[in-house]
Amino acid sequence: MTAGAQVIANSGHDDMIHDAVLDYYGRRLATCSSDRTIKIFEIEGESQRLVETLKGHDGAVWSVAWAHPKYGNILASAGYDGKVLIWREQAGSWQRIFDFALHKASVNIVSWSPHEAGCLLACASSDGNVSVLEFKDNSWEHNIFHAHGLGVNSVSWAPATTPGSIVSSNPGPGSTGNRRFVTGGSDNLLKIWTFDPATNGYKLEREPLAGHTDWVRDVAWSPTVLQKSYIASASQDKTVRIWTSDAANPGEWKCKVLNFDAAVWRVSWSLSGNVLAASSDNNKVTLWKENLKGEWENVKTIEE
């Protein structure tokens, strides 16, 4: 973590940094800022080196995301200008390989699917729409659809494997390459979307998950593929909700509420999916774990 902190401290950005993401191997860090640029750093132990500054957005850049390395050195960025830009590094040189500009308002976040599902990028916009870009056969295709009336703040993909299939002797069809994701909106709702091969588009899997009383700022689908699915949602209403679904009843979601003393902006799962980090308006990051009784406990608080 020290190297990451050093990079941010000496970022070279001229304005606020909105996102900082390490690549799959932890050797590169991409940052983005209100100064309209993206910066790429090489990380070597405790040291870091700025190797590239990418320019192309006409406003603040909110989000950056690395594709899985099986698809090459590909980075996506999204910003206030309503654009999603795809960048690729080849032979040490970064180039912009695709511009997506069909959103009519800020694109707030971009998220790559698990690589087993394909090279898919979900983009959430303040115009109320979600777009899914797919890179195949050396070209980009897209799906765009209306998701939340007051704007979409967040999107997170489900694991490619359904819960229970790893421990089941008969995982059944469709157990890998799952194309499902959850979105969170300014309508206070979460919605789960699934790919429908019949229409070649995405459809609402079930009724929206309701309970938050203010904007849903972030959603995070746990990468765990054991017996349950977990989705965490962070809200302006000073709560995090943890939604769980059992492999036996995949359409049924139960909810536990974690109360905070400030609005919660981001939630993030550990790689194993058993620890949840939440960051809130009071400059605190809290870590949560589920105990044997199924209750969520605050196991650590980090204050800056």
From Swiss-Prot:
Subunit and interaction comment: The COPII coat is composed of at least 5 proteins: the sec23/24 complex, the sec13/31 complex, and the protein vtr-7/sar1. Component of the nuclear pore complex (NPC). NPC constitutes the exclusive means of nucleocytoplasmic transport. NPCs allow the passive diffusion of ions and small molecules and the active, nuclear transport receptor-mediated bidirectional transport of macromolecules such as proteins, RNAs, ribonucleoparticles (RNPs), and ribosomal subunits across the nuclear envelope. Due to its 8-fold rotational symmetry, all subunits are present with 8 copies or multiples thereof.
Disulphide connectivity of cysteines: none
Entry keyword set: Cytoplasmic vesicle, Endoplasmic reticulum, ER-Golgi transport, Membrane, mRNA transport, Nuclear pore complex, Nucleus, Protein transport, Repeat, Translocation, Transport, WD repeat
PANTHER family in the record: NUCLEAR PORE COMPLEX PROTEIN SEC13 / SEH1 FAMILY MEMBER (PTHR11024), PROTEIN SEC13 HOMOLOG (PTHR11024:SF2)
Known function: Component of the coat protein complex II (COPII) which promotes the formation of transport vesicles from the endoplasmic reticulum (ER). The coat has two main functions, the physical deformation of the endoplasmic reticulum membrane into vesicles and the selection of cargo molecules. It also functions as a component of the nuclear pore complex (NPC). NPC components, collectively referred to as nucleoporins (NUPs), can play the role of both NPC structural components and of docking or interaction partners for transiently associated nuclear transport factors.
GO CC terms, sorted: COPII vesicle coat; endoplasmic reticulum membrane; GATOR2 complex; nuclear pore outer ring
Subcellular location: Cytoplasmic vesicle, COPII-coated vesicle membrane; Endoplasmic reticulum membrane; Nucleus, Nuclear pore complex
RNA-binding among keywords: no
WD repeat residue intervals: 12-51, 56-97, 102-143, 147-203, 211-253, 259-298
Biological-process GO terms, alphabetical: COPII-coated vesicle budding; ERAD pathway; mRNA transport; nuclear pore localization; positive regulation of DNA-templated transcription; positive regulation of ER to Golgi vesicle-mediated transport; positive regulation of protein exit from endoplasmic reticulum; positive regulation of TOR signaling
GO molecular function, one term: structural molecule activity
SMART domains: WD40 (SM00320)
The name this protein goes by in its record: Protein transport protein sec13
Membrane topology reported for the UniProt record: Peripheral membrane protein
Family statement: Belongs to the WD repeat SEC13 family.
Main localization of the protein described in the UniProt heading: membrane
PROSITE patterns according to UniProt: WD_REPEATS_2, WD_REPEATS_REGION
Presence of keyword Cytoplasm: no
SUPFAM superfamilies: WD40 repeat-like (SSF50978)
